Amino acid sequence: MLAGLAGSGRALEFGIGTGRIALPLSGRGVPVHGIDLSRAMVARLRAKPGSDAIAVTIGDFATTRVDSSFSVAYLVFNTIMNLTSQDAQVACFGNAARHLEPGGCFVIECRVPELRRLPPGQSVLPWHVSEENWVAYSYDPATQAMHGHYVEFTGDQGEYRTMPFRYVWPSELDLMARLAGMRLRDRWEDWDRTPFTGDSRKHVSVWEKA
């Protein structure tokens, strides 16, 4: 899908990380530029074959500009939720639009908020339990703040860490896109273009710049 949207143009990845998406996309002949705040993640990208063909700028993808225009910009695997305020998420859409050529597309892959799975009267949703780790998510419906809670077990010891997110609804993303001068072109449940329904637990959405 991303290669098709890029066509003969260039692709911009917000949160390029270790290159899980960028490397195969670059391998298909699409020029890719990435933005990421983590130098450690980019170092892991640079250790992989083919990474020399990918340009990377260190910075916050919600605000960092690069001196190029692109046919497609994309942000995958729930990374929009790493921006923990609505203002930052709105800024991300504006930044994507500024980098896109007219007719270019911004693609986001994100989960649908799981609030309906919460037990009545509770704010914590168990997500994964195994002998090696526990994962749970807590939600604040008033602020859309969300925290991931992770426990990793090594022998008799457990290490706990937490990570903040902001969950966001598909319709809210559509409004952010409109504020940035883009309109919804397509929305699917997954990269295979499965139709998006009320039962879908994630979405891949494409907005087009006017």
Predicted regions and their residues:
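Conserved alpha-helix/loop element of class I SAM-dependent methyltransferases that forms part
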Residues: M1-S8
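Conserved class I S-adenosyl-L-methionine
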Residues: S8-G15
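Class I SAM-dependent methyltransferase SAM/SAH-binding core
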Residues: T18-T63
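A short acidic, Gly/Pro-enriched loop at the edge of an enzyme's catalytic core
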Residues: A62-V72
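A short SAM/SAH-binding and catalytic strip from SAM-dependent methyltransferases
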Residues: S71-D87
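A short glycine-rich, Lys/Arg-flanked "PGG" loop and its adjoining helix->strand segment in the class I
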Residues: V90-P102
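SAM-dependent methyltransferase
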Residues: V107-R178
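C-terminal lobe and adjacent flexible extensions of AdoMet/dcAdoMet transferase-like proteins
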Residues: P170-A210
